[in-house]
């Protein structure tokens, strides 16, 4: 009986350990990265001759490739070391997160009604969250 109790507690402990997420949540990662960016802004703008393309419009979710190309350019021109490395590591993790989310855009054949529901939701987000230029 005692052995059964010990095994049950051991199994419960193992389940608890494996249930704890090993990765930092994306929202916390973004908050930390924003703080690091604010902290290291002066260091990052030290190279005043460097020019990085900036997307013209403000619908950032459409320009992720351009944003990450700019990050790559900035990283290659920045002296590495200390906490600035943490900034670029976080940006790399954010890029991986976005890449993983994009994979969820894969197509799955569904009924027209389900597609129209998705389209309506998409247009609703576009209407409320995107800056639509005239």
UniProtKB/Swiss-Prot annotation:
In Pfam terms, one family for this protein is IL5
- Report keywords, A-Z: Cytokine, Disulfide bond, Glycoprotein, Growth factor, Secreted, Signal
Keyword Phosphoprotein included in the entry's annotation: no
Which family does the record claim for this protein?
Belongs to the IL-5 family.
Q: Which gene encodes it?
A: IL5
Source organism per entry reads Macaca mulatta (Rhesus macaque)
Q: Which GO terms describe its biological process?
A: immune response; interleukin-5-mediated signaling pathway
PANTHER family xref list:
INTERLEUKIN-5 (PTHR48491:SF1)
InterPro entries assigned: 4_helix_cytokine-like_core, IL-5
Name the record gives this protein: Interleukin-5
UniProt function note: Homodimeric cytokine expressed predominantly by T-lymphocytes and NK cells that plays an important role in the survival, differentiation, and chemotaxis of eosinophils. Also acts on activated and resting B-cells to induce immunoglobulin production, growth, and differentiation. Mechanistically, exerts its biological effects through a receptor composed of IL5RA subunit and the cytokine receptor common subunit beta/CSF2RB.
